[in-house]
């Protein structure tokens, strides 16, 4: 039986905790039952962090085809990009080429089918911008790389997932004052379609149940506390219903996240970042996973940043990375099973 392709992990900012959590996750691979993964990036940066953290983590420089064979005894690393001179906790714009090279190499493996899914370690936007990175973040970079001539560009959707709660913010990194101007019926409909489609295909939910938070307190109280919920959110929900998607809303966000309410839906779509990320991180601060929906490949990430202040100290918690690795493997396996079934059906029809 052929072993499944491994996951591939980008290094993230070498001055942050990406190397720390990667190494500590691998060190706990047996007790955690982690799926095999390969790191794309600078081996010397990892070796330096091994020494600083006092860990026993041998590295094996290899490619994805041999990663699973090495994984039990050594952390597989595929060298990629320039060497990093960054020190833990000392962000430096000169690290940007190292970060991009790691990400490009990891993505290339996934797009070539040599890795099953992409897991990205955290980067610092300020460092990347100072180094000339032209994208707002990981997600936009990946969407641009996934674009194909003659086809619409992918519409990436950020979902924060845990066993307790899955949420999607319709708008992400915007000042709150700018949110109403960015909300449109088309945006919410497209977001709902992508969420429903990926929850069905990759998460195995036959009929995903979506709820849409109201923008305003009490979901606007029928227009008395703002007009956006009746003018934008409700028409979007009705449009999704006409397409056969199980959608409800707008609903008051303040009563959507207690256990009884959560039992009634699969994904909550919020109108702005903190509306849904506060409950998500309250319920699963260490175990949340950032999943990018709407891309032609699987991408997960720990739901935290670079944490420069604790990089290299041994205090970084790898739990979110562990959850991201496990979810990436689960989604990749589900997609492989679905592709196999579709292939069998196509063959039987032919």
From Swiss-Prot:
Which purpose does this protein serve, as stated in its record?
Answer: Catalyzes the NAD(P)-dependent oxidation of 4-(phosphooxy)-L-threonine (HTP) into 2-amino-3-oxo-4-(phosphooxy)butyric acid which spontaneously decarboxylates to form 3-amino-2-oxopropyl phosphate (AHAP).
Q: Looking at the UniProt record for this protein, which Gene Ontology cellular component terms does it annotate, in alphabetical order?
A: cytoplasm
**So which cofactors does this thing need?**
Zn(2+); Mg(2+); Co(2+)
* Pfam families from the UniProt entry: PdxA
Where along this sequence does the record place binding of substrate? 138-139, 281, 290, 299
**Protein's recorded name:** 4-hydroxythreonine-4-phosphate dehydrogenase
Q: Which transformation does this protein catalyse, written as a reaction?
A: 4-(phosphooxy)-L-threonine + NAD(+) = 3-amino-2-oxopropyl phosphate + CO2 + NADH
Name the pathway it acts in.
Cofactor biosynthesis; pyridoxine 5'-phosphate biosynthesis; pyridoxine 5'-phosphate from D-erythrose 4-phosphate: step 4/5
**Which Gene Ontology MF annotations are present?**
4-hydroxythreonine-4-phosphate dehydrogenase activity; cobalt ion binding; magnesium ion binding; NAD binding; zinc ion binding
UniProt enzyme class: oxidoreductase
| Keyword terms of this UniProt record | Cobalt, Cytoplasm, Magnesium, Metal-binding, NAD, NADP, Oxidoreductase, Pyridoxine biosynthesis, Zinc
Recorded coiled-coil stretches:
none
Q: Which GO terms describe its biological process?
A: pyridoxal phosphate biosynthetic process; pyridoxine biosynthetic process
Q: What is its EC number?
A: 1.1.1.262
Main localization is: cytoplasm
Q: Sorted alphabetically, which InterPro entries does this protein's record hold? A: PdxA, PdxA_fam
* UniProt cofactor note: Binds 1 divalent metal cation per subunit. Can use ions such as Zn(2+), Mg(2+) or Co(2+).
- Which positions bind a divalent metal cation? 173, 218, 273
Native species: Xanthobacter autotrophicus (strain ATCC BAA-1158 / Py2)
Supply the gene name.
Answer: pdxA
Under the heading SUPFAM superfamilies, the entry gives: Isocitrate/Isopropylmalate dehydrogenase-like
Organism domain of life: Bacteria
- Other notes: The active site is located at the dimer interface.
Q: State the compartments where it is located.
A: Cytoplasm
Q: Which family does it belong to?
A: Belongs to the PdxA family.
- Taxonomically, what lineage is the organism? Bacteria, Pseudomonadati, Pseudomonadota, Alphaproteobacteria, Hyphomicrobiales
Task: Summarize the subunit comment.
Answer: Homodimer.
Keyword Metal-binding found: yes
HAMAP family the UniProt entry points to: PdxA
